[in-house]
């Protein structure tokens, strides 16, 4: 919701479609109400984009309802901390699916649309690694590589819109925020504090301005 709020503040009466696999809860409904108070036409659609048909139906329904789709922010992700040797195939699949299968499905479902941007929320773990998160790091590394792949398709005129993969650090607020235990451990081991909302918004703007496939925050 952090970036949806920024769009609502900066754009005039934007249409914002937020999606997720889970049913809308009370906190999310409150944030939707806030987006609407900011002037946005905001709604939530429950969908699992790791299912090819569901992703296709989502994009079809959006373009049917609103005639156009200007951009995509793919921020799906799931963490199941454990050492790789201890993880089951099911756990690996659950972690990889949102950032791998989900990304491919959404990209292919929008391949015919003249998007302005296609932004991928990756993680610093794909660059620096993270204990107990080998599968998560791999999923994010896929996103980084996919950004370059999609930009090549844009150059070849098979896709539209700038693709950018952003390697985010720990967050202070929002849906990707770290819990207090991880926050304290990271501070102790690295001296790094979680990123605040204002920093993330500026990082997104600057990342888009750089015109690169990938930026590390």
Residue ranges and their predicted role:
Residues 1-217:
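4′-phosphopantetheine-dependent carrier domains
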């Amino acid at each position: 919701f952090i970036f949806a709020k920024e769009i609502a503040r900066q754009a005039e009466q934007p249409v914002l479609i937020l999606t997720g696999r889970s049913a809308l809860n009370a906190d999310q409904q409150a944030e939707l109400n806030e987006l609407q108070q900011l002037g946005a036409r905001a709604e939530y659609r429950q969908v699992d984009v790791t299912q090819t048909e569901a992703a296709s139906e989502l994009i079809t329904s959006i373009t049917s309802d609103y005639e156009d789709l200007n951009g995509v922010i793919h921020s799906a992700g799931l963490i199941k901390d454990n050492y790789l040797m201890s993880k089951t195939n099911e756990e690996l699949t659950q972690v990889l699916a949102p950032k791998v299968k989900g990304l491919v499905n959404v990209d292919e479902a929008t391949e015919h649309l003249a998007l302005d941007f296609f932004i991928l929320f990756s993680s610093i773990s794909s660059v620096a690694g993270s204990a107990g998160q080998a599968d998560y790091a791999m999923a994010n590394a896929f996103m980084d590589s996919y950004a370059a792949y999609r930009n090549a398709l844009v150059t070849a005129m098979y896709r539209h819109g700038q693709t950018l993969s952003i390697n985010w650090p720990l967050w202070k607020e929002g849906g990707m925020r770290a819990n207090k235990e991880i926050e304290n451990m990271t501070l102790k081991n690295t001296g790094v504090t979680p990123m605040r909302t204002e920093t993330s918004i500026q990082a997104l703007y600057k990342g888009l301005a750089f015109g690169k496939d990938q930026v590390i925050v």
